[in-house]
UniProtKB/Swiss-Prot annotation:
InterPro entries: 3-IsopropMal_deHydase_lsu, Acnase/IPM_dHydase_lsu_aba_1/3, Acoase/IPM_deHydtase_lsu_aba, Aconitase_4Fe-4S_BS, Aconitase_4Fe-4S_dom, IPM_dehydratase_rel_enz, IPMI_cat. Its EC number is 4.2.1.33. It catalyses: (2R,3S)-3-isopropylmalate = (2S)-2-isopropylmalate. The keyword Metal-binding applies. It is an enzyme of class 4 (lyase). Belongs to the aconitase/IPM isomerase family. LeuC type 1 subfamily. This is 3-isopropylmalate dehydratase large subunit. It comes from the Bacteria. GO terms for biological process: L-leucine biosynthetic process. It comes from Brucella canis (strain ATCC 23365 / NCTC 10854 / RM-666). Keywords: 4Fe-4S, Amino-acid biosynthesis, Branched-chain amino acid biosynthesis, Iron, Iron-sulfur, Leucine biosynthesis, Lyase, Metal-binding. Its cofactor is [4Fe-4S] cluster. Pathway: Amino-acid biosynthesis; L-leucine biosynthesis; L-leucine from 3-methyl-2-oxobutanoate: step 2/4. Gene3D superfamilies: Aconitase, domain 3.
Length: 469
């Protein structure tokens, strides 16, 4: 009888093509997602070597990072570097026979939202993309992670990847989530607990009642930020919630094939007694709405708390780092989080740009107005999310409240397009990173849930969403 295996063990074992004595493995890759920033050199490498894309039907190209989200983007991309990258992806996809969603295609959007929408992402698969937030797809019980540009070329050419296996880590979130606390708060709390290096060398499996209670969109938010906790990837075992989400998707199995697939997917869970190298447990019932205060995703505190004092940190290097973060953020120890005013609000990204995120934000702002000191924007994660939101009338709620309603794309998550902060501007953001300059030169980012961001837009400062009226 074989030893109990984790979910990660099972997917890994199913995809090993060859293993060397030092543990280095050649893994088969089931799905490859491509965007315009990390792929040009990879395609050029194929072109110079005279190689085709080995499995174009297992590859999907989407433009997302550089595309403008302004309504007039149909007139073309003004930034020359961005335009060159977008044009290169369109040309490369055509030359190599890869399916491509341009900015004019309603299926276009952030690659990690598009994959699941299309049924391209399925349980038990290995999925890669030249983007760190590929971990998002782990919400389906798929082994998904980012790769570098040279690896993008290797996968395009061979449909395989050279890897060494990571260790297993289990994060259990037990109990029921309180009202006002979301998947975003869970994952920020996890990162606050383990730190940004806590998952280094591991693949994290998320489990527990609170995780099981989440929708697929909430689970994608959790797995999306696994990389911010240092992990190679994040996984959630598939269940009926997963199967229902997949049914009817354009590229998902249908009919009898789907039933056969579901029978297999039901085996994708960690066995009783499977070994985890590290286990972390959180109590969902004690979690509050969370706001980041510094320049690292581990710098988090309850919305009812205060900016911490770095002098309380024993480690000298870490203490100096946190003082630097406070200086960059323009904050002082002891400042109440609810006293921090914001200049900008960004609701979107591959972390929180899905329809449920927009519904949560709309519920908060309906019948209210954005504070006169705040510039707020809503960026749907894909054209299909935008279409659904407009069918539900959410765009009218946002526009009437004073939000800017945009076209889909990565937008202000990162300063690679026209949406960015000005120096010194402070933003309540539903994205995943609050590094120095992430949203623009000297911009200050606070990571929050969609409901918290929406409330900050109305109030002009952070508020406890649990007391929102």
């Amino acid at each position: 009888m074989s030893a109990p295996r984790t979910l990660y063990d099972k997917i890994w074992d199913d995809h090993v093509v060859d293993q060397q004595e030092d543990g280095t493995c050649l893994l088969y890759i089931d799905r490859h997602l491509v965007h315009e920033v990390t792929s040009p050199q990879a395609f050029e490498g194929l072109r110079m070597a005279g190689r085709p894309v080995r499995h174009p039907e297992k590859t999907l190209a989407v433009v997302d990072h550089n595309v403008p989200t302004s309504p007039d983007r149909i007139n073309g991309i003004q930034n020359e570097e961005s335009r060159i990258q977008v044009e290169a992806l369109a040309r490369n996809a055509a030359d190599f026979g890869v399916e491509y969603y341009s900015e004019r295609d309603k299926r276009q959007g952030i690659v990690h939202i598009v994959g699941p929408e299309q049924g391209f992402t399925l349980p038990g698969m290995t999925i890669v993309c030249g983007d760190s937030h590929t971990s998002t797809h782990g919400a389906f019980g798929a082994l998904a992670h980012g790769i570098g540009t040279s690896e993008v070329e290797h996968v395009l050419a061979t449909q395989t990847l050279i890897q060494k296996k990571a260790k297993n880590m289990l994060v259990r979130v037990d109990g029921k989530l309180p009202a006002g606390v979301t998947a975003k708060d869970i994952v920020l709390a996890i990162i606050g607990e383990i730190g940004t290096a806590g998952g280094t060398g591991y693949v994290i499996e998320y489990a527990g009642e609170a995780i099981r209670s989440l929708s697929m969109e909430g689970r994608m938010t959790i797995c999306n930020m696994s990389i911010e906790g240092g992990a190679r990837a994040g996984l959630i075992a598939p269940d009926e919630t997963t199967f229902e989400y997949i049914k009817g998707r354009p590229r998902a199995p249908q009919g009898e094939t789907l039933e056969q697939a579901i029978n297999y997917w039901k085996t994708l869970h960690s066995d009783e007694g499977a070994h985890f190298d590290k286990i972390v447990t959180l109590d969902a019932g004690s979690l509050p709405p969370i706001v980041s205060w510094g320049s690292s995703p581990e710098d988090v505190v309850s919305v009812t708390g205060v900016v911490p004092n770095p002098d309380d940190i024993a480690d000298e290097t870490k203490r100096a780092s946190k003082w630097r973060a406070l200086d960059y953020m323009g904050l002082k120890p002891g400042t109440k989080i609810t006293d921090i005013a914001v200049d900008r609000v960004f609701i979107g990204s591959c972390t929180n740009g899905r329809i449920e995120d927009l519904r949560a934000a709309a519920k908060v702002v309906e019948g209210k107005k954005v504070a006169p000191t705040v510039n707020a924007m809503i960026v749907p994660g894909s054209g299909l999310v935008k279409e659904q939101a407009e069918a539900e009338g959410l765009h009218k709620i946002f526009i009437e409240a004073g939000f800017d309603w945009r076209e889909p794309g990565c937008s202000m998550c990162l300063a690679m397009n026209d949406d960015r902060l000005k120096p010194g501007e402070r933003c309540a953001s539903t994205s995943n990173r609050n590094f120095e300059g992430r949203q623009g030169f000297k911009g200050r980012t606070h990571l929050v849930s969609p409901a918290m961001a929406a409330a900050a837009a109305i109030a002009g400062h952070f508020v406890d969403i649990r007391a929102w009226k």
